[in-house]
Amino acid sequence: MSDAFPEMTVGAGTVLTTDQAQKAVWCGAQFIVSPGLNPKVVSWCIDRNIPVIPGIATPTELEAALDLGLTTVKFFPAEAFGGLKTLKAISAPYGNVRFMPTGGIHPENLNNYLSFLKIFACGGSWMVP
């Protein structure tokens, strides 16, 4: 895809292992997104200068991401964990962290999420039926 559309930034999502990350990058992925925080995947990406956005749902997981040097994370599954209200509460002590919520995001709640300044993007399967 990245060869066919060189102006497009292409990433790989739902990456669970370093083997999957390696294959995705070999296929042209320029960044990696994971549903959870796998330190091996994060370290593999950091060691290769590949942007990585792992999933977190709790302050403990966010602290682990910060310990790995990350300041950009995915909040997943957003709606199942309380949505924007929970994200605002979790993010309050972490002024330098930016979030990409996914999971339960849809056209009706998208603008509410995007109005929160700590959110840089939202994801959802509804975007690609």
How should each PLM-predicted stretch be described?
Residues F31, P35-V41, K74-L84, K118-P129:
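Glycine-rich phosphate-binding active-site loops on the catalytic face of alpha/beta enzymes
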Residues A12-G13, P101-I105, C122-W126:
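Glycine-rich beta-strand-to-loop/alpha-helix junction loops that act as flexible
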Residues T17-C27, T60-L68, K85, S91-A92, ...:
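Catalytic cores of alpha/beta
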Residues F76-P77, V97-G104, N109:
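Short, glycine/charged-rich beta-strand-loop motifs at protein surfaces that mediate ligand recognition
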